[in-house]
Amino acid sequence: MNAVGIDISRGKSMVAVLRPFGEIVLPPFTVGHSNAELNALAEQLKSIEGETRVVMEHTGRYYEPVANTLHNSGLFVRAVNPLLIKEYGGNSLRKVKTDKADAQKIARYALDNWADLRDYTPMDTIRYDLKTLN
């Protein structure tokens, strides 16, 4: 059971990979949004032993290339409402706000909600065209 949390930003993302009980599979690292880097990320995640689920916040349109590339490579991907991540574990006294901390929080969310996660479905062309008109 490998939970991948991705904190999406414009042009790059922070990736953290955790297992239950806080075991760090891969220390947090940055990946760019170029096709080559996203394809390399997909291969790296697919090479990890065990079932892997990728979770990210759906933030504007920035998440779409990441989600689509990972989904098309055969990985389980889920884009969740950022409010769910914000509210998750929000009772901490320490308010750490870094990309690394956010990616790890998203990975912990994935582990705690493993059974309820539904796989990402990319938008069809018509829906995507309508969305981009806004």
Regions picked out by a protein language model, each given a short descriptive name:
Residues 1-134:
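Phosphate- and other anionic-substrate recognition elements at nucleic-acid/protein interfaces
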